């Protein structure tokens, strides 16, 4: 199996991407990681004797975080991100990963990889940790600011299959993000999609309020990209604030420091559950080729886990399963 990595994408690239690739092949020697980007910058973080299952594909350009996505993808065709997506489209690799510009990755995915038959709009996923020791797969978290009811049903089908095949959730539950749990709650979109989700071949558990997401109210949470992105940023901000305040309190006095020492094992476990690096990358579902988005701040561990996620995606043939399900349920038809 061959996985392409945009070696120049992310806040800590190329060091994090290269070291993550080395960690991934150490854990699974059967895979080959293709590092795409500035060859010399990549080599600076590789051992003198480069492992046989690490390859370098030169790419002279880099799409920066503040680049306008569509313009950057069209003008920087030799960028590490675009080259990696093209490799996936041309079947030179089985999947690609980037921690770079999210908008550019989505644009490149649409322009080069293309949408799956029947999919109108791909959806970007994210993992939100919950109190059950699992994650809630949330989509869409920013690929499309607006969505139609039948498109949310497509998100639900794709997310449910991904949760089952890659995350290992047996018959995952699906929830609709809303302002209340009652069936009649919400705006026109959520009211319209509710009965469609009930009719679909899904383990639909109804509306889910934002406050219940981290309690594990469902395995797959469906929403439009605007609402999903707001939820994701709120969760990230809350987690960051909590850890910052805990650190401040635990270091404010000798007694607090002693208490922190006693609580340290539990705090470490809690932080690990909340750490995005544990979950690696999340997919852009609905594209013909597997495209995985890693967090922009990904470190070595996060990149390694993103490669692991991509490997599972390919092994479980998720795209083919999604395509068959869409054809079976004719969910690609507009309503």
From Swiss-Prot:
Localisation = Cytoplasm
Identify the GO cellular component terms for this protein. cytoplasm
The UniProt entry's GO biological process terms, in alphabetical order, are:
fatty acid biosynthetic process; phospholipid biosynthetic process
Q: Where does it mainly reside? A: cytoplasm
Which pathway features in its UniProt record?
Lipid metabolism; phospholipid metabolism
What InterPro entries does the entry give? FA_synthesis, Phospholipid_synth_PlsX-like
**What EC number(s) are associated with this protein in UniProt?**
2.3.1.274
Q: Which UniProt keywords apply?
A: Cytoplasm, Lipid biosynthesis, Lipid metabolism, Phospholipid biosynthesis, Phospholipid metabolism, Transferase
**Catalytic function, reaction form:** a fatty acyl-[ACP] + phosphate = an acyl phosphate + holo-[ACP]
Pfam families under this entry? Answer: FA_synthesis (PF02504)
Molecular function (GO) terms for this protein are: phosphate:acyl-[acyl carrier protein] acyltransferase activity
Q: Which SUPFAM superfamilies match?
A: Isocitrate/Isopropylmalate dehydrogenase-like
Task: Report the domain of life of the source organism.
Answer: Bacteria
Task: Respond yes or no to whether keyword Lipid biosynthesis is given for this record.
Answer: yes
Q: Does the entry feature the keyword Transferase, yes or no?
A: yes
Q: What do we know about how this protein assembles, alone or with others?
A: Homodimer. Probably interacts with PlsY.
Tell me its family: Belongs to the PlsX family.
Provide the function of this protein.
Catalyzes the reversible formation of acyl-phosphate (acyl-PO(4)) from acyl-[acyl-carrier-protein] (acyl-ACP). This enzyme utilizes acyl-ACP as fatty acyl donor, but not acyl-CoA.
Q: What is this protein called?
A: Phosphate acyltransferase
Species of origin reads: Brevibacillus brevis (strain 47 / JCM 6285 / NBRC 100599)
């Amino acid at each position: 199996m061959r996985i392409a990595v945009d070696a120049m994408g992310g806040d800590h690239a190329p060091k994090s991407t290269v070291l993550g690739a080395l960690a991934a092949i150490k854990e699974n020697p059967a895979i080959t990681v293709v590092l795409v980007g500035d060859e010399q910058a990549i080599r600076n973080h590789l051992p003198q004797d480069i492992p046989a299952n690490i390859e370098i594909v030169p790419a002279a350009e880099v799409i920066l975080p503040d680049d306008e996505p569509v313009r950057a993808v069209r003008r920087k065709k030799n960028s590490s991100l675009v080259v990696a997506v093209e490799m996936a489209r041309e079947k030179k690799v089985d999947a690609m990963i980037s921690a770079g510009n999210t908008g550019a990755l989505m644009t490149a995915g649409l322009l080069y990889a293309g949408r799956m038959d029947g999919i109108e709009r791909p959806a970007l996923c994210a993992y939100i940790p919950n109190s059950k020791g699992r994650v809630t797969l949330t989509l869409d978290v920013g690929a499309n600011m607006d969505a139609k009811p039948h498109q949310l049903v497509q998100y639900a089908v794709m997310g449910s299959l991904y949760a089952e095949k890659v995350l290992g959730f047996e018959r995952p539950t699906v929830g609709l993000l809303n302002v209340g749990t009652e069936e009649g709650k919400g705006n026109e979109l959520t009211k319209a999609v509710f009965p469609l989700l009930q009719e679909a071949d899904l383990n639909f558990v109804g509306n889910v309020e934002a406050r219940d997401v981290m309690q594990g109210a469902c395995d797959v949470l469906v929403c439009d990209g605007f609402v999903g992105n707001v939820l994701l940023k709120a969760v990230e901000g809350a987690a960051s604030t909590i850890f910052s305040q805990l650190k401040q309190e635990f270091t404010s006095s000798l007694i607090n420091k002693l208490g922190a020492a006693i609580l340290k094992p539990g705090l470490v476990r809690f932080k690990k559950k909340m750490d995005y690096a544990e979950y690696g990358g999340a997919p852009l579902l609905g594209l013909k080729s597997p495209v995985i988005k890693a967090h922009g701040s990904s470190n070595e561990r996060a990149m390694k886990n993103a490669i692991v996620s991509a490997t599972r995606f390919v092994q479980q043939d998720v795209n083919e399963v999604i395509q068959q399900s869409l054809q079976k349920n004719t969910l690609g038809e507009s309503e």
